[in-house]
């Protein structure tokens, strides 16, 4: 069939249908979303859960959600800005922080469903592939699917660090090692040691050492927050190990204490009736006293 020019006449505009709003805004890939939210037809009223991972300049968000007609419902959420409670005070958007955030959301949802004692996940972090095995006499493992949104799924991306943390935390997420750091597309091989180094922030530590040797001014500028907190390259692995242990010990969400703000009043308070009468009486008395003083003078 040859080229057919689209004639934008009255009939064209009369039948024209606009795309979904979030497609017009460039926020949702509906081709992927359709395949992520549609449940098998032989599973009645069973939600299809998604592990939603989103990255921003200052934060990493991990949510477990399922779709309904009126909109998605968030079951559980974890954020990398919660990590300072576990000792990770800097580098809240790197691969190691993404792993910690994924681990946190996994332990939190399992604690909420009372499955945290049955499915402890992978406690010895080696960077190798780990798949959750369901227990024989008990509920199955919590299954969800990774939702990356519009992000690029390149090898070594932080999104897969969050997924690895969730898998090691005890969630059943279908995946392979092809997108983890340490996988070589040329050799079709996976080096778990490289992946483990990223999980414990050793790629950051190596860069700290290199930069400190080559350019001290650049080191002080790049790692100023690390220097202010007294964190050195050799301390990073210990920090993340302690964070993993702390997350497993207490993954529950803690609300921030409410700030008690002292209200400042910049306008005069409204007087009561008695106060107004007393004020007028005082003015009258002062005025009469002044007149009396003038007469006597």
From Swiss-Prot:
Highest taxon in the source lineage: Eukaryota
GO CC annotations, alphabetized: cytosolic large ribosomal subunit; nucleus
Subcellular location: Cytoplasm; Nucleus
InterPro entries given in the database record: Rbsml_uL18_euk, Ribosomal_uL18_C_euk
Pfam families given in the database record: Ribosomal_L18_c, Ribosomal_L5e
Function comment: Component of the ribosome, a large ribonucleoprotein complex responsible for the synthesis of proteins in the cell. The small ribosomal subunit (SSU) binds messenger RNAs (mRNAs) and translates the encoded message by selecting cognate aminoacyl-transfer RNA (tRNA) molecules. The large subunit (LSU) contains the ribosomal catalytic site termed the peptidyl transferase center (PTC), which catalyzes the formation of peptide bonds, thereby polymerizing the amino acids delivered by tRNAs into a polypeptide chain.
Record family assignment: Belongs to the universal ribosomal protein uL18 family.
Protein name: Large ribosomal subunit protein uL18
Taxonomic lineage of the native organism: Eukaryota, Metazoa, Ecdysozoa, Arthropoda, Hexapoda
């Amino acid at each position: 069939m040859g080229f057919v020019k689209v004639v934008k006449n009255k009939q064209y505009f009369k039948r024209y249908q606009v795309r979904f709003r979030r497609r017009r805004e460039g926020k949702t890939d509906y081709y992927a979303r359709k395949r992520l939210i549609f449940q098998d037809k032989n599973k009645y009223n069973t939600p299809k859960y998604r592990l939603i991972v989103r990255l921003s300049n200052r934060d990493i968000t991990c949510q477990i959600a399922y779709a309904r007609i009126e909109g998605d419902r968030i079951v559980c959420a974890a954020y990398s800005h919660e990590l300072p409670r576990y000792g990770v005070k800097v580098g809240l958007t790197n691969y190691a922080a993404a792993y910690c955030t994924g681990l946190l959301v996994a332990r939190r949802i399992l604690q909420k469903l009372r499955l945290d004692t049955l499915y402890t996940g992978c406690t010895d972090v080696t960077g190798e592939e780990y798949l959750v095995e369901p227990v024989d006499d008990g509920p199955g493992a919590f299954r969800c699917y990774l939702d990356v949104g519009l992000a690029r799924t390149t090898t070594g991306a932080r999104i897969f660090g969050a997924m690895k943390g969730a898998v090691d935390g005890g969630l059943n997420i279908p995946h392979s090692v092809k997108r983890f750091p340490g996988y070589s597309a040329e050799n079709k091989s996976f080096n778990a040691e490289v992946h483990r180094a990223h999980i414990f922030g050793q790629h950051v530590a190596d860069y700290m050492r290199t930069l400190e040797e080559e350019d001290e001014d650049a080191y002080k500028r790049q790692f100023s927050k690390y220097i202010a907190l007294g964190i050195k390259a050799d301390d990073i692995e210990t920090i993340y190990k302690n964070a993993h242990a702390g997350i497993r010990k207490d993954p529950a969400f803690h609300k921030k204490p409410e700030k008690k703000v002292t209200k400042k009043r910049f306008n005069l308070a409204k007087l009561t009736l008695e106060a107004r009468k007393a004020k007028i009486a005082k003015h009258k008395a002062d005025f009469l006293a002044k007149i009396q003083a003038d007469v006597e003078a």
